[in-house]
Swiss-Prot record:
Subunit field text: A double ring-shaped homohexamer of HslV is capped on each side by a ring-shaped HslU homohexamer. The assembly of the HslU/HslV complex is dependent on binding of ATP.
Keyword Chaperone tagged: yes
Covalent S-S links between cysteines: none
Annotated InterPro entries: AAA+_ATPase, ATP-dep_Clp_protease_ClpX, ATPase_AAA_core, Clp_ATPase_C, HslU, P-loop_NTPase
Function according to Swiss-Prot or TrEMBL: ATPase subunit of a proteasome-like degradation complex; this subunit has chaperone activity. The binding of ATP and its subsequent hydrolysis by HslU are essential for unfolding of protein substrates subsequently hydrolyzed by HslV. HslU recognizes the N-terminal part of its protein substrates and unfolds these before they are guided to HslV for hydrolysis.
Any one of the GO CC terms: HslUV protease complex
SUPFAM superfamilies for this protein: P-loop containing nucleoside triphosphate hydrolases
Gene3D superfamilies in the record: 1.10.8.60, P-loop containing nucleotide triphosphate hydrolases
Record key words, sorted: ATP-binding, Chaperone, Cytoplasm, Nucleotide-binding
Binding-site positions, ATP: 29, 71-76, 261, 328, 400
Gene, per the UniProt record: hslU
Organism per entry: Rickettsia felis (strain ATCC VR-1525 / URRWXCal2)
Protein family per UniProt: Belongs to the ClpX chaperone family. HslU subfamily.
Protein name as it appears in the record: ATP-dependent protease ATPase subunit HslU
GO biological process terms held by the UniProt record: protein unfolding; proteolysis involved in protein catabolic process
Length: 450
């Protein structure tokens, strides 16, 4: 059964948990427990917004710990969830961080990056709202360059019509545009400096403000290129930057989702690595505690509270166990969800059912060369069989194994497709066997190829 897009009845609180699960089913196979957990977490956010009085601030999100091997859908569930709600979503690996005082990124940069995403989201929406006015102003600036500021309204109307019809797209003009060349080498962070905790120190911004940031330069360019540069410039002038920043901070604080992957790699196992490494891992966990529990992080846009940001942590936990995390951190991730390893049936469903399944992707790619690529049911079963075999014998990387198998399977077809226009190619089990059986039976080779 193929997952299809459904139109739902309007609910004042957005999608219901069952609707969220149905939406996730369009892209992700199985893992019902994990889908259910994130759907409830998302709905509880909407419920919290409708609670009145002081009680609303006391209701905090129940953060989630996903436990499962690589390639079973942990990241995809969180990513699709964020897209579903248009929430600012930030994914990071726990191994990227070091304890404060060591060289490397500190955990507060998570919130700074999340706010940056929220600001860009709000800016994009605001620019869409002012697009018509910005386009009008851009055309006026181009007309000034083409016919001069003192030209008659009749002349301007004639040229405006030509611009709108695209007749002047390849006409070269000389026009003043904002100088976006970075002054003083752009952005960087200075470890241990106050600026590092406030966000990124940008020398260009600092020097620009000191000298006056409205610097322009005259450039020669085609009308169509000028439109592409000037419309965003005019949009920036029309939107209320302070309002955007306030809305973005509010969006990040109340709807932000942070996905921390590989959290098992910072768990202290007591036997792996040197003592210093253990201390550093524990330090990162301790730095994460206030962030997940709720604190205020200073960013270049202003202070951001993390109390109502939803944190989803995940890890394979092959060597370490969830109980190896600091007890305080375990307590801040109260919902635990175990994701199942993928079976042969799951692999078959992954190849066929999602709206953006791999089979559909490869068929579409080869289809651009006017070649009709078709997969027989026997081929799908054989591919799934090989994926499970290699995962068991070499290393379990879940659904990601299908990518490497399909790339090897279709290598010759992808190479020769441009010379096969108008042809129909059917992939069956014999074709799969001919292409892959030698690699599958030689496990030493499979380790390197698949």
């Amino acid at each position: 059964m193929k997952a299809t897009k459904t139109t739902y009845k309007k609910d004042p609180m957005g999608l219901t948990p069952s609707q969220i699960v149905n939406e996730l089913n369009r892209f992700i196979v199985g893992q019902e427990k994990a889908k259910k957990a994130v759907a409830i977490a998302l709905r509880n956010r909407c419920r919290r917004k409708r609670v009145e009085g002081n009680l609303r601030n006391e209701i905090v999100p129940k953060n989630i710990l996903m436990i499962g091997s690589t390639g079973v859908g942990k990241t995809e569930i969180a990513r699709r969830l964020a897209k579903l709600t248009n929430s600012p979503f930030y994914k990071i690996e726990a191994t990227k961080f070091t304890e404060v005082g060591y060289v490397g990124r500190d955990v507060e940069s998570i919130i700074r990056d999340l706010v940056e995403i929220a600001v860009n989201t709000k800016k994009t929406l605001a620019k869409m709202e002012v697009d018509i006015n910005a386009r009008e102003k851009a055309i006026e600036r181009i007309l000034d360059s083409l016919v001069g500021k003192t030209s008659s309204s009749e002349t301007r109307e004639k040229f405006k019509e030509k611009i709108l019809n695209g007749k002047l797209d390849d006409t070269e003009i000389e026009i003043s545009v904002a100088d976006t060349t970075p002054v003083g080498g752009g952005s960087f962070e200075i470890p241990g400096m106050p600026g590092a905790s406030m966000g990124v120190l940008n020398l260009g911004d600092m020097i620009g403000r000191a000298l006056g940031s409205s610097k322009t330069k005259t450039k020669k360019m085609l009308v169509k290129d000028a439109m592409a540069i000037i419309i965003p410039e005019e949009s920036e002038k029309l939107i209320d930057q302070e309002k955007i920043i306030q809305q973005a901070i509010n969006l990040a604080e109340n709807d932000g989702i942070v996905f921390i992957d590989e959290i098992d790699k910072i768990a202290s196992t007591g036997s792996s690595g040197a003592k210093n490494a253990e201390i550093s891992r524990e330090g990162v966990q301790r730095d994460l505690l206030p962030l997940i529990e709720g604190t205020t992080v200073n960013t270049k846009y202003g202070p951001v509270k993390t109390d109502h940001i939803l944190f989803i942590a995940s890890g394979a936990f092959h060597i370490a166990k969830p109980s190896d995390l600091l007890p305080e951190l375990q307590g801040r991730l109260p919902i635990r969800v175990e994701l199942n390893s993928l079976t042969k049936d799951d692999m078959i469903k992954i190849l066929l059912e999602p709206e953006t399944s791999l089979v559909k992707q490869y068929s579409a790619l080869i289809g651009t060369e006017d070649v009709h690529l078709e997969f027989a049911a026997s081929a799908i079963e054989k591919i799934a069989d090989y994926a499970i075999t290699v995962n068991l014998e070499v290393e379990d990387i879940g659904a990601r194994r299908l990518h490497t198998i399909l790339e090897n399977l279709l290598e010759d077809i992808s190479f020769e497709a441009s010379e096969m226009k108008g042809k129909k190619i059917t992939i069956d089990d014999k074709f799969v066997e001919n292409q892959l059986s030698k690699i599958i039976t030689n496990l030493d080779l499979a380790k390197f190829v698949l």
